[in-house]
Amino acid sequence: NTDSIFDVQVKRLHEYKRQQLNALNIIAQYNYLKANPNADFVPKTYIFAAKAAPGYYMAKQIIKLIWNISQELKKDKKLNEKLNVIFLEDYNVSLSEILMPAANISEQISLAGTEASGTGNMKLMINGAITLGTLDGANVEIHEQVGDDNIIIFGMNVDEVNACKSGYKPMDIYNSNAVVKQAIDTLQYGINGQQFNEIADSLKNSDPYMALKDFDSYQKAQAYASECYKDQTKWQKMSLANIAGAGIFSADRSVEDYARDIWGLSK
């Protein structure tokens, strides 16, 4: 559906980058639309592209999950017009040159305090995508450049993550949040004929990157993004603010700073 929001998460597949949080939210949206087929739902196409390290079993399971979600959605044509998932194989620079200009939402959802920096969010920003993310890595600098109104921030900050770690019990969230419980149970019942018990068990029993803790906030951020997109004048202003604010991330500015501040050189 070319009229849908293109919600893009393209990066290395790792649990700290939390593609599993994105997938869990898609499952929750799928469950909602199955129960409410006539709901007023802004159509969304979730686009993933990622590679996992050869020996990283859980990352490969998450790729398998995303692909099976995409196949399950295709079984219901009416629902698939509202909710679609695409996993692009063999992600590389050439593919990113096509994908990044097409993105409406840039998913930068790592657990706060885990991302060193990264440049993918900057590339999406300069192409006009709106960042939906945590206060982690270069998202902090993007936030400083575009302001509160032109970025969608959710989840815990670093201090809140550190305060929560010692007593974190994801099973408590599973038992108290009906939407989370149904989504995780769906992993165990099966998606496109495949069960994902190991992902479900990890989320319920350890959840090392606190996907369940940030789930409610993430859902609200997604809902807010959909509401913003309905107002195309507002959305285009947000997009232009991101393009205009991206200049600080240019290589020229970075080299100038190094030459002046580190190497003591003048023009």
Describe the residue ranges of each PLM region:
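Long, K/E/R/D-enriched contiguous segments that form extended
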Residues: 1-96, 111
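Hydrophobic beta-strand segments of well-ordered beta-sheets in folded domains
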Residues: 44-46, 105, 131
